[in-house]
Amino acid sequence: VYKRQVDYALKRLGVEAVITADKEELQSADKVIFPGVGEAETTMNHLKATGLDELIKNLRQPVLGICLGMQLMCRYSEEGGVDCLNIFDVDVKRFVPQRHEDKVPHMGWNTIGKTNSKLFEGFTEEEFVYFVHSFYVPTCNFTAATTDYIHPFSAALHKDNFYATQFHPEKCGKTGEKILTNFLNL
């Protein structure tokens, strides 16, 4: 579902994307978007079985992980207790509600605090992005943007050519288009 939504968002920007798991196509792509749908353990097992885990880690072009894609770029996930790609040396944690009104999964619109990541050029802190997730990445050295639900966490990560968002830019209207455009312009 989400990879099709990313494809539609890119088409609205005039970009013709190729949805593929072909290693040669991925290696020769100008940019790679790694959207995630599903559960960490199952998806990591698939990536390992197909050799895509090593390929993704060794990509040199800009890579954007979205939602589960971001989580899988981390070291370890509490979802399934699985070792992940370890691009970002940080573990993915499960949200634990602290109050009755805290609902998991976190579904909704949040503003985010940004840093100087190129992904957020022209972005104001009054803009909202859409989240739907039960697991989060704590703030860390790779945090490119933060938000707060139950407690502060990483809304986006950045290291070298790897960018990642916990939120779904493809569902965020003009704000998401701006983020995707910034990624495409890297």
Model-derived segments and spans:
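Structural signature of beta-strand start/N-cap positions in the alpha/beta core
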Residues: 16, 31, 62-64
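Amide-donor transfer/coupling interface in amidating biosynthetic enzymes
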Residues: 58, 91-186
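Structural motif
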Residues: 33-35, 164
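Cysteine-nucleophile active-site neighborhood
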Residues: 38-107
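Short acidic low-complexity segments
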Residues: 17-28
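Short, small-residue-biased leader/transition segments that mark boundaries at the very start
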Residues: 1-2
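Structural alpha-helical scaffold elements that stabilize or flank donor/cofactor-binding regions
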Residues: 25-26, 55, 156
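A short, Lys/Arg-enriched amphipathic alpha-helix followed by its capping loop at the start of a domain
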Residues: 9-16
